[in-house]
Structures are given as C-alpha cells and as structure tokens.
Amino acid sequence: ALISGGGSGHEPAHGGYVGTGMLDAAVAGAVFTSPTPDQIYEGIKAIATDKGVLMVIKNYTGDVMNFEMAGEMAQMDEIKVAQVVVNDDVAVDGSLYTVGRRGVAGTVFVHKIAGAKAEEGVELEEVQRVAQKVIDNVRTMGVAIRPCTVPAAGKPGFELGEDEMEVGIGIHGEPGTHKEPLRPADEIVDHILDKILADIDYTGHEVAVMVNSSGATPLMELFIINNHVADVLAAKGIKVYKTFVGEYMTSLEMEGFSVSLLRLDDELKALLDAHADTIAFKA
C-alpha cells in the first residue's frame, strides 16, 4: 500500500491521487504545514496490508521527521513500513524548509509509477526500488511571476515587482534562488532546461515531461511553455514519450509553473502507461 501527503494548498496533490493504480491514502496537514505523526500513523493503519506500506515523502524537514515518526509507531504495531524521499528540485540545495533538495512536482511521477508497481502485488522492497528509480531519474525546476499568500501569514511569502519573476521557486511560497526581470516564456524555459539537463544526462533517452501550473497560470500559457520544451528537447535529440500539462502540484494562487523531466527505460514506460483511475490523474 502507498501513502503520501504534506501540507494543504497543493491541490490536487495529494488527495487527488488516491485511487486505483496510485496512492491508497493521502494525509493533509494545515496549509503548507506537515501533517502530524498521529495523523500519518492513522493513515498507515487504515491501509496496511500483509505486504506493508511505502511512505512517499517530499524532502522537507517537517515532512520527513513526521512521516518517520509515524513509520516507527506503525512498526511497533508490527506493520512493515518502508520509505522513499523525493528531492527532484534542481534549483536549491538547502532552504528554509529543507536539508538538501526539495521535493516538488516530480513526486506525482513517483505516485504514478510506484502505484502501478504496487498494483502488481509485488513485495514492498520491489515497490520501494521502483519508487527510488523514479526519484533518481526525475528533475524539476520552477519560476513564479506572482507570489501566494498563506492565510495564517496574511501576506505574500515574497515580494515581486510588476516586471519581476522569482527563479527556482518552491511549492510553499518560499523564495527561489534569485529575482530577475520578467522574460519571454521561451527564454525562461531555456534557463530551466539548461539547469535540468546539466544535472542529469538525458541524451539518447526517452523522457516524460510534466508542465505544472503553480495554481493561477492558465492552460493556454502552459501549452505555450510546453511547445518550447518540446522544441528544445527535439533539438537536443531527446525524444518525448509522454507529456502531462496542467495542475498537478500547486501553491495556492501562485502564478508560475514548473517543468519536470523523467528519464525513462522500458520498465518505467510500462508502469507510466499502466491503468490509473483517480480524481486528478487517469491513465
């Protein structure tokens, strides 16, 4: 069984991915706040099977700590628990919320592919192996042109001028690496892909692309972005196997987007194509 979760405000993540072929449970904390160990523990108990439970955790200090505590509580109940930590963001190595890289939209690929593997009824270690394989092969980076406001804070997480953008943005409204003047979509995509392609060698591989809205970016703009992503990858000889465009992991009303690339092999392609039926994702 698969469980994931995190703060609210990222809808449809993570509750939208509960269903056939993906997650068995999702645990939501308050807005941009990790769920408590007790909440996660109750989720684990609700879905536990003889084969055990895999926790898919985004790499934020609170998430990792609380999920690990919940996992230990479940193990005391003799429930078999394993975990993977998603850290796909190439923009930042360490931030307010993290040690190391943040877990962002690439997490959805982990839900999909590990969920497909779990549907096969294999052992927990095999589901964990496949989930880790996705993490090892997925990279993401995002930008924002308008911040979001956490209700409890009452003000935006960072300030942006009318003609500015924040590069390397996180999914909790935390600032990115730097601000710079707003640029055309193609130039922004070039910068993002330069960072992603420098981090992992996609040459000669097929990839899955995810262009994800931060919450307030309309589909038309996402398709403009995706069009240039496809052009850049084609020029570099990287074949796009499948493309996902839409809202997969948002940040309240933030205006911006992220691009994720997943390097594929035959195993990952088959699992990506496998049947899934959830509110937010169907295959």
Locate predicted features.
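Short alpha-helices
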Residues: 86-126, 130-137
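Short, acidic/small-residue loops that bind anionic groups at enzyme active sites
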Residues: 26-31, 75-100, 236-240
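Glycine-rich oxoanion-binding loops at beta->alpha junctions
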Residues: 19, 23-50, 197
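Gly-rich Lys/Arg/Thr-decorated short loops/hinges at beta-loop-alpha junctions or inter-strand turns
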Residues: 1-5, 14-27, 92-94, 165-181
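C-terminal non-catalytic interaction/assembly regions of soluble proteins
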Residues: 195-283
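Short Gly/Thr/Asp-enriched flexible loops that form oxyanion-binding sites at enzyme active sites
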Residues: 64-78, 97, 221-227
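Mixed-charge interfacial surface used for oligomerization/domain docking
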Residues: 120-224
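Short glycine-rich or small-residue beta-strand-to-loop segments that form or flank ligand, phosphate
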Residues: 1-7, 23-26, 52-61, 68-71, ...
